[in-house]
Amino acid sequence: MQMKKALAWSKNNATVNILKMVGIQHFVDFAKKLGIVSDLHAFPSVCLGADAISVIEMMRAYTMFPNYGINPKPIYITRIEDRNGNLLENFVPERKEVINEVTAFKMIRMMMGTVLFGTGRRLKPAYGVEGECAGKTGTTNSESDAWFIGYTPQLLAGAWVGCDDRFIGEGLGEGARAAMPIWGLFFKRIQADNKLGYNAIDKFDKPSIMEGLDECDAVDEISLQRAAAQLNVTRGEDDMADPNDEPGETNKFDPADKGTEDNDYK
């Protein structure tokens, strides 16, 4: 299975196999490089969201994609002016390159699959989000944490729904059911406010170094439709199911579990 398809449909066996290839400690070290300051435990489940991480940390890590490899440190105040509009202080975030722009663009294209035909495919039709956007849903054991981190060429935002006590489940609290609607409504309001200067039809620019190259691994409608057929997907974690239905796919993984072997992911 291609990674773009596994990512779009949250097929976590693929994620675990990639972790095994790169190494758990390397994964943890790279996460720290992206601004994750919370404790990360070197277990296989670390790649599936087993550790508690704040929304701002996750958002900072994701900024490397729409910023084409650049990971800025979040700041809350950009400038200070006096009552007459004179600039007193200007603040510029620290910026560092963590991946190259080609890798970042490929990840953007892959993550667009989540919104086009993956677990987040209800985002555009349900909330009227226009233009290109990419993101990822996330759900932990017993649906105690629901995530959606998404971005457009101009703006990135994240939503988390859950409890301090992670043993409390939410029933239908999967990422696309509980967190993605918050993100969708937020962006819908941004699009409707002309004062913000938000361009809803803006597109992700292809790096100049890739011009003339065949973007064979880009996410497109046909490939994802084929992926859905191959996976026999009839319900995703975003389907608004009856409360009596069994919940959709979640990231159930025991920290002691070493994962499963599947030659299709190698």
Please report, for each region that a protein language model flagged, where it lies by residue:
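Low-complexity, Gly/Ser/Thr/Pro-rich intrinsically disordered linker/tail segments
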Residues: 209-266
